[in-house]
């Protein structure tokens, strides 16, 4: 049984979150949580929270056994970018893009 959890509009770029997602793809959930706990990146905390949510969804909604679960799919899509202005010298301004991403984790017992 596949169970999904999503974090939409996560405040990190998709490029940075994908680095972390690649670490846990295909792993058992216990091993994935351990890897994410000791990964020193902001995106690791975001991905870990989504993974924990997916595990809780599988246990509560589908009655799955946690020991059998593995990360079947994990992917990070780009979300909308927030446009901000940074003032520069001589009355100029630069545009800053604050990027967001959508993190999706699918856990499965197969």
Swiss-Prot record:
One of its GO terms (molecular function) is structural constituent of ribosome. Keywords: Ribonucleoprotein, Ribosomal protein, RNA-binding, rRNA-binding. One of its GO terms (biological process) is translation. InterPro entries: Ribosomal_uL22, Ribosomal_uL22_bac/chlpt-type, Ribosomal_uL22_bac/org-type, Ribosomal_uL22_CS, Ribosomal_uL22_sf. GO terms for cellular component: cytosolic large ribosomal subunit. It holds the Pfam family Ribosomal_L22. Belongs to the universal ribosomal protein uL22 family. HAMAP family: Ribosomal_uL22_B (MF_01331_B). This protein binds specifically to 23S rRNA; its binding is stimulated by other ribosomal proteins, e.g. L4, L17, and L20. It is important during the early stages of 50S assembly. It makes multiple contacts with different domains of the 23S rRNA in the assembled 50S subunit and ribosome. Part of the 50S ribosomal subunit. PANTHER family: CHLOROPLAST 50S RIBOSOMAL PROTEIN L22-RELATED, LARGE RIBOSOMAL SUBUNIT PROTEIN UL22M. NCBIfam families: rplV_bact. This is Large ribosomal subunit protein uL22.
């Amino acid at each position: 049984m596949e169970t999904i959890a999503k974090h939409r509009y996560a405040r990190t770029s998709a490029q940075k979150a994908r680095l972390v997602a690649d670490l846990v793809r295909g792993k058992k959930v216990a091993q994935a949580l351990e890897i994410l706990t000791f990964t020193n990146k902001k995106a690791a905390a975001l991905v870990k929270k989504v993974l924990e949510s997916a595990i809780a969804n599988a246990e509560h909604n589908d009655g799955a056994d946690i020991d059998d679960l593995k990360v079947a799919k994990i992917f990070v899509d780009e979300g909308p970018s927030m446009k901000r202005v940074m003032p520069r010298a001589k009355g100029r301004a630069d545009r800053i893009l604050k990027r967001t991403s959508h993190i999706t984790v699918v856990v499965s017992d197969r």
